[in-house]
Swiss-Prot record:
Expressed in testis, kidney, liver, lung, spleen, brain and heart. Keywords: Calcium, Metal-binding. One of its GO terms (biological process) is negative regulation of G1/S transition of mitotic cell cycle. Disulfide bonds: none annotated. GO terms for molecular function: calcium ion binding; calcium-dependent protein serine/threonine phosphatase activity; chromatin binding; protein phosphatase regulator activity. Residues 460-491 are annotated as: Disordered. This is Serine/threonine-protein phosphatase 2A regulatory subunit B'' subunit delta. PP2A consists of a common heterodimeric core enzyme, composed of a 36 kDa catalytic subunit (subunit C) and a 65 kDa constant regulatory subunit (PR65 or subunit A), that associates with a variety of regulatory subunits. Proteins that associate with the core dimer include three families of regulatory subunits B (the R2/B/PR55/B55, R3/B''/PR72/PR130/PR59 and R5/B'/B56 families), the 48 kDa variable regulatory subunit, viral proteins, and cell signaling molecules. The gene is Ppp2r3d. PANTHER family: PHOSPHATASE 2A REGULATORY SUBUNIT-RELATED, SERINE_THREONINE-PROTEIN PHOSPHATASE 2A REGULATORY SUBUNIT B'' SUBUNIT BETA. Ca(2+) binds at residues 344, 346, 348, 355.
Amino acid sequence: MPERPPIRALRRDPDDPAVAQALASLARGSDLVFPSRFQKWLRDFRQVHAHRKEEPPPQSPPPGHTVPAFYFPCGRPPPRPQDTEDAIALVECAFEGLPRGRAGLGDMAVVAKACGCPLYWKAPLFYAAGGERTGSVSVHMFVAMWRKVLLTCHDDAARFVRLLGHPGCSGLIQEDFVPFLQDVVNSHPGLAFLRAAKDFHSRYITTVIQRIFYTVNRSWSGMISREELRRSSFLQAVSQLEVEPDINRMTSFFSYEHFYVIYCKFWELDLDRDLTIDRSDLARHGDGAISSRMIDRIFSGAVTRARLPRKVGKLSYADFVWFLLSEEDKTTPTSTEYWFRCMDLDGDGALSMFELEFFYEEQAQRMAARGVEPLPFHDLARQVLDLVAPRCPGRITLRDLKQCGLAGEFFDAFFNVDKYLAREQREQAGTPQDTDSDPAASAWDRYAAEEYDFLVAEEAMAEDDDDHDEGSDPIDLYGLADEDCDDLEPL
């Protein structure tokens, strides 16, 4: 019988694919294969594979380039960590000059300056360090808080949110501003006359808070984010409080004269003195210039965002602040959004011809009642479409109104008959509006200045009138001792 191949030799390299293949061939019936022939075939096969270059293992892709960080929600970190310790050293030096190394709220001006913060950050710094619980803060309490702020917040917006806001929150709600603004009332020289009238502290604070959210909270979310603070001028206004003794020059947010105008306008409408107004009260604003259909939309909840339960069919003082700011200055983005929400009946983000006709129908009736022949709706529609130039014919979006720059003219044509007719008369006469006013002042600033002068003159005349009726109800900002209501809380 033929001698079989040396199986033991083949097993010396069992991982060799050629050996495995040879063994498989033998298993399928290798009795017909002569040993010499098989060994020759195996030798030739190995020689061929020995000359082949072993394929290199697959290479991993080249490492990607490191993308530098570009998103800093809390501000860009400082280039040197040592900057934090230097800042802490300045704070510790400030506490060394205080009695017992502790700071009360009255001492926080020195600490705020040592922190490199504006003066009126003193109350937020004090309360963030736990001063409200103990009445004062030690250097250890304050340094522990301030080190965390410096390590996690790297610009003014992030630090302001961290100091005023609740732990873990990335934004500020309205209640967060109350301690800060109360300190402004208590310590700013321009508000010294207001400190004795404690009943009106909450009214002033509520007004300022609503103005802050009206201007800064562009998302209408009810929470001011760090990015919204960065894009606004609010922090610059807070810094300006330190160098501007006349609070009335701070027209963006803090002006007392502006508060006086807003509150007096509300007081004139709130006949029952419950600090709320209903539809009939609001209908008297501006001698009934605003249409009833628009008033219904204001009370529908389209532009009110109170988190607390409200009285049905009532507007709070905070709601009225938004209404008055929007009505008297229709050039601001928030005003455009306010009235657009009111006119967008179906909430689809566009004003259709049906919605425009719905509001103009009452406007035309009110013009006819004043002896003015109104334009047919189709003629007015062509005029406003030419005015706005919407991207989609027959549908006006919020973006269209903001881009055209004539949102005030558009809105007045549909729900404020007095302003619409006054504008038409000026255009026919060829006279510009407010020729004697400051061109840099906003429409709201001009309105507030005119109304404040009128209210002051009205009070002066009432005081000089010896025949003044004692039973009448003049507007008295400080003489409301008979008012039976709680302090107005910011909504």
